[in-house]
Amino acid sequence: MIRRPPRSTLSSSSAASDVYKRQVILRENSANIPSTANVLIEALPYIQKLANKIIVIKFGGNAMIDDRLKNNFARDVVLLKQVGLHPVIIHGGGPQITSYLEKMGIKSEFVDGMRVTDDKSIEMIEMVLGGSINKEIVNLITSHGGRAVGLSGKDGGLIRAKKMVGEGKNKNFDFQNTGMVSSIDPSVVNLLDATPFIPVIAPIGIGEDFKTYNINADIVAGKIAKILQAGKYVVLTNTTGIFDDNGNLIKSMNAEQVRQLVNKGIISSGMLPKVESALEAVSAGVQNVQIIDGTIDHAILLELFTDEGVGTMIRRT
């Protein structure tokens, strides 16, 4: 004999009250659904446009030392790969290098925004960049479900370098083991891009004499964006973007406008290598470069997948 389930002991008014409460909760929860759906719909055309494109990202600044921002960055990168983009990460490590050198009793020196790398510090810098920082980023990406491979410019002959030569008043300055990019061989990056793996590159180069050079990460990122003909080149910084002489954020500017601000001294110091790499990239065919605030949560996604974007866009014309 089939037994019927016992009838509810609740009164009809009590049951009706529970149903009403559930309906109220459902309505409250569904209030956020339209806005969430709108975000996804807004992102769709950008995802379609950038599908199968290489996205070069220069990871640097405070985003590299704040745990929340580091994890958000890793999640963003994994998402890019999942939706069909090909992120290539080039990271800096200035604050970590400076801190480590201070512990070793070595003072950091900068000229025109470039670190001067002496014989005492080059081995330590390579260890910090290619060791602890690079592997931490790889581990973060892995922890959020991605697959990453850490590289330095020495791997696969990726970055060939030569000694940096100063310009203007610093043309005779000896930058010692600070280098310039002489050539990029993207073979190893291209191999990884065709797989589920995300390349994470430390800006260490090797000279023709097999000497190790420390290279500014912004310069390396710009060169790699250029040689890979990246669909996008994104630079994470500690500022909202580029400002005019009145302190107003410039949302979009062309190469000539950037040069004017450099000549006026409005763009200076650590921002110089960033805009120089951006100018080289756009002049070589990269459609545009975004300089964005890496301290904003999910800044990469906001820049790539929303109508408004964040930061400053640099375009060729």
List the predicted regions and their residue ranges.
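Nucleotide/pyrophosphate-binding catalytic subdomain
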Residues: S17, K21-T295, L301, E308, ...
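Single conserved hydrophobic/aromatic residue that forms the stacking wall/gate
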Residues: M1-Q23
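A residue-level signal for beta-strand positions that form part of recognition/binding surfaces
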Residues: G311
